[in-house]
Amino acid sequence: LCFDCKKYFQLLKPDYFYNNVKTEKAVLVGVHRKDDKENRLKDYLDELEALTTTAGAKTMARLTQNLEYPDPRTFIGEGKLNELETLVKVHEADLVIFDDELSPSQIRNIERVIKEVKILDRSMLILDIFSKNAKTAQAKTQVELAQNQYMLPRLTKMWTHLSKQKGGIGMKGPGETEIETDRRVIRSNITKLKERLELIEKQNTVQRQNRSDKKRVALVGYTNVGKSTIMNLLSNADLLAENKLFATLDSTVRKVVLEDQRYEGVHVPILLSDTVGFIRKLPTLLIESFKSTLAEVVEADALLHVIDVSNSDFENQMMLVKQTLFEIGAKDKPTLLVFNKVDQYMAQHPDTVLTEFEKSWLSKEHAPVVFVSATEKINITGFKQKIVELLNK
């Protein structure tokens, strides 16, 4: 690679956005559209702050604006942009993170006003978190493919970023010839990564076929709802179960033997898989890249849709998961709705009668439901029996 091109590929390393020298400070930006509910923006920015924390930065301030449509030039209005500039200076921020995907021209226009800080959008932030959390060859390849595809149309803009980085990474951007050369390199890289993923998927398909004698059940749900904790509980495994967004990227499969409570001595062996969590505004490129991982969901005999019932936005999270299942071709799978963290929900709503709450969701969803707490081990026996009954339908 040419020298300038090597500098570009530093963008594909996990530590591009965040360094280990200090905790970087961030200002978050969100837009409230006319169709949004009153408290929706707060929930959205709470989630963005959680993503920011997961990535290793500290949120110093938030800036919001009510807009019918985002400004095509700078996403937020001119007055708000000046207000953002002031916030960045007051808090000595290193990052500005928008809760939407920005176009290359929007980032360039914002940079003309907000100088000497990194301007990130939601997609860039999520890609960086995925890059840090990828452990297997498959996950690393999937993330790198998504990064390359995301960066390709933004290459000119990213050279602007590089020219601003402290530490002397490039004092000025390359000429048109260098950028075209680098575009060819990235396109070639995308082709190679796709070929590598196809090979990995062929190997995975063979492995799944070899496991075809057992029923396959996949855990699905929004990120950080407790899927890995439930996986550990059912399989007696020791997977990473952190209170962080996207702690699990790789699809992990464990053999689990359930006992049918209706008949003494009857056991039901299953293969249980834990999958990457979904999230609002998950970059389309990531969904495309992770389709091979999500094959565990598409080919499963049944799904356990895990929901954090203690989250005030859990109904919208449920809808997003259902939409994603529709997009990957898994919406008609037999599904058990697993309302997790019921202990926290009951602490928040002490007057709730749990049996009535369960009945209301049963009538709403026309699907089996169960209320559990994986951490407190509440109603686990009933949960296991619901899985058995789901598979016997």
Where are these regions (language model features)?
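Conserved beta-strand segments of the P-loop GTPase G domain that flank and frequently precede/overlap
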Residues: 28-32, 62-65, 97-99, 304-308, ...
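Conserved nucleotide-binding/hydrolysis micro-motifs of P-loop NTPases
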Residues: 32-36, 67-69, 101-104, 124-127, ...
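Flexible beta-alpha connector loops of hexameric P-loop NTPases
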Residues: 35-40, 70-74, 133-137, 178, ...
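Conserved G1/Walker A P-loop phosphate-binding module
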Residues: 20-23, 161-287, 294, 298
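Canonical P-loop GTPase G-domain recognition
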Residues: 115-167, 331-336, 343-393
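Conserved C-terminal guanine-recognition region of P-loop GTPase G domains, centered on the G4
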Residues: 44-53, 85-90, 100-117, 259-268, ...
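N-terminal accessory targeting/assembly segments
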Residues: 1-126
